[in-house]
Amino acid sequence: MVTQNKKILIITGSFGNGHMQVTQSIVNQLNDMNLDHLSVIEHDLFMEAHPILTSICKKWYINSFKYFRNMYKGFYYSRPDKLDKCFYKYYGLNKLINLLIKEKPDLILLTFPTPVMSVLTEQFNINIPVATVMTDYRLHKNWITPYSTRYYVATKETKQDFIDVGIDPSTVKVTGIPIDNKFETPINQKQWLIDNNLDPDKQTILMSAGAFGVSKGFDTMITDILAKSANAQVVMICGKSKELKRSLIAKFKSNENVLILGYTKHMNEWMASSQLMITKPGGITITEGFARCIPMIFLNPAPGQELENALYFEEKGFGKIADTPEEAIKIVASLTNGNEQLTNMISTMEQDKIKYATQTICRDLLDLIGHSSQPQEIYGKVPLYARFFVK
């Protein structure tokens, strides 16, 4: 219980929506706990520190999944010593120092890989608990902050990854990845499908087209899935691509086994009401799917965290990787045509999923903050440190 005024500073990043969604889930949960003495502030560190350069980097990051895969692969799989020498380790340093001086937080929570935090924790005993929520299923060096108080990770295998690189096991908690609480609540699947003019007795294949950032080839995929999966219907989420939505509606407007949607706030309901999902393996998307126990097909995952997530889910029996649309269609047909494998995958997910990650993490954060004291050392040392590095 927080009985004195305390402040949590959340450092996040807007590279993709996942990190922001995790942050919002935690903020909402803490707000729901009605803690009068707790204030929570969040900052998109890189965007605030270097808005123009970060905007360029974000565009490159998004396009790297389509056009610069080898370049991103080289960055992601670089040796740790190369990352240590990269300017990225110091990116946002001045802004971070100023935030700590201004806000004087009692706890820092990272929901985005923030190597610059390591610069502070390695140079100073800042006496501020630092906790990290890791939003992927395999460890990458950028998630490690020396002298951290806590790491919240998705699985016991992820914890072992941390232990293998020398992290104290007592600092790593297997909590699952925090998602919106609505993914934990029951859904009347039959009624949802009926309300959307779909047949609850058919197997529903959910396709998230917006996740792929492309607008071609989905008409053929839908046609082939329906041709090879006799008892299937397809729900296509087009995201913000109005062109894709228009073209698919025109092609399938008379087909009662196809529903074309644009951007939707009802992914929870669709995941809960579908038997199989074709998507990209972003950490939050697949965690939401995991919570709803919907097996997934990962179409041509990009090297890096996407591929690592997909490999883990395939290894655990939660999903399958398809390198091409044709391979994805074959997998759909195999899983939906009376194959027990789909039922077994769902059963495995039911057994392995971790519930209520957000609540678990928030309770532990409150415990950490209850034992923290207002730091003093950093406020004397940081101004000199800032002048040394930033000028």
Swiss-Prot record:
Pathway: Glycolipid metabolism; diglucosyl-diacylglycerol biosynthesis. InterPro entries: Diacylglyc_glucosyltr_N, Glyco_trans_28_C, Glycosyltransf_28_UgtP, Pro_diacylglycrl_glcsylTrfase. The lineage of its organism: Bacteria, Bacillati, Bacillota, Bacilli, Bacillales. It catalyses: a 1,2-diacyl-3-O-(beta-D-glucopyranosyl)-sn-glycerol + UDP-alpha-D-glucose = a 1,2-diacyl-3-O-(beta-D-Glc-(1->6)-beta-D-Glc)-sn-glycerol + UDP + H(+); a 1,2-diacyl-sn-glycerol + UDP-alpha-D-glucose = a 1,2-diacyl-3-O-(beta-D-glucopyranosyl)-sn-glycerol + UDP + H(+). This is Processive diacylglycerol beta-glucosyltransferase. Gene3D superfamilies: Glycogen Phosphorylase B. It comes from Staphylococcus aureus (strain JH9). Coiled coil: none annotated. One of its GO terms (molecular function) is 1,2-diacylglycerol 3-glucosyltransferase activity. Transmembrane segments: none annotated. The gene is ugtP. One of its GO terms (cellular component) is plasma membrane. Keywords: Carbohydrate metabolism, Cell membrane, Glycosyltransferase, Lipid biosynthesis, Lipid metabolism, Membrane, Transferase. Belongs to the glycosyltransferase 28 family. UgtP subfamily. SUPFAM superfamilies: UDP-Glycosyltransferase/glycogen phosphorylase. Its EC number is 2.4.1.315. HAMAP family: Diacylglyc_glucosyltr. Pfam families: Glyco_tran_28_C, MGDG_synth. Processive glucosyltransferase involved in the biosynthesis of both the bilayer- and non-bilayer-forming membrane glucolipids. Is able to successively transfer two glucosyl residues to diacylglycerol (DAG), thereby catalyzing the formation of beta-monoglucosyl-DAG (3-O-(beta-D-glucopyranosyl)-1,2-diacyl-sn-glycerol) and beta-diglucosyl-DAG (3-O-(beta-D-glucopyranosyl-beta-(1->6)-D-glucopyranosyl)-1,2-diacyl-sn-glycerol). Beta-diglucosyl-DAG is the predominant glycolipid found in Bacillales and is also used as a membrane anchor for lipoteichoic acid (LTA).
